[in-house]
């Protein structure tokens, strides 16, 4: 009499799953327990569409930048659209922790001189700002003793909660200049020539929340040395506080890793307080939108991207949320950090969405400095 050892359903399913995994490895032409030997090999698997069989969301890939390791988490597969239409697959990576702490963009100028602005008395009325600070609707005057050349700027920064008269006015020869032509003191009044075309008070005080035009976008996609990364994108732009101290992210980045990264098509809504429409960017490295890290869209009629499985599948919530979520927390040296997104807030022209130390959705002025957590795609 023979004894038949029947497998339980659970054991049978486990063994079938293991067998199926072996078959996947065989079909992909790689060994069981696949470990890629190069970034180029990973790229080959992605282009062949085999990456979903070989990798899992949450797997990590490591590269170096200036001999410092950068750990990347796989956060999605075939979620993003490559900029180059000949490719259809993508493997999305996100830094496990901030690689640096970066100002999104500097406070902007108030006025740009299309032609030379002669010495004399002028007045401005910053509007639609803060009732207790810059943009309170009052008219202020000031007198220049030196002309502002064509292409020059008048800078009056201020704050949301302080009397604009607490701040002096500086003039510069252009957006890249840091040498002040002269400093003058404003007073309340309407004497002289009105300068009708001026920047929004939010951006005068705390910078612009336009990602496409931002300084941080230039930094994370540049290979240039410090001092050569940033160039003004608008007439009101001013140099970021890292302009002379930070090299572009690509400077010193592992060349083999960089060669496997392709440009990704992304869209970012513009702040409707002062603008309309949606910007498209095609970059190798980018910041995540709020929808991509599972906090929903800023505007209900514009989708800035599908939530990555890394955030959606392991969230503390079952639907997109703006609350504290441990899966969104990024650490540096053991401490939780704020980190930048790319989405502008709807109600202010300066605020940019970020992730709080609790994983909660937040916002802050572009002139603040927070963690740079970059995303990219092997394509």
Report residues per predicted region.
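Short, low-complexity N-terminal tether/leader segments at secretion or assembly junctions of large
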Residues: 1-20
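Collagenous Gly-X-Y triple-helix signature in extracellular proteins
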Residues: 17, 21-379
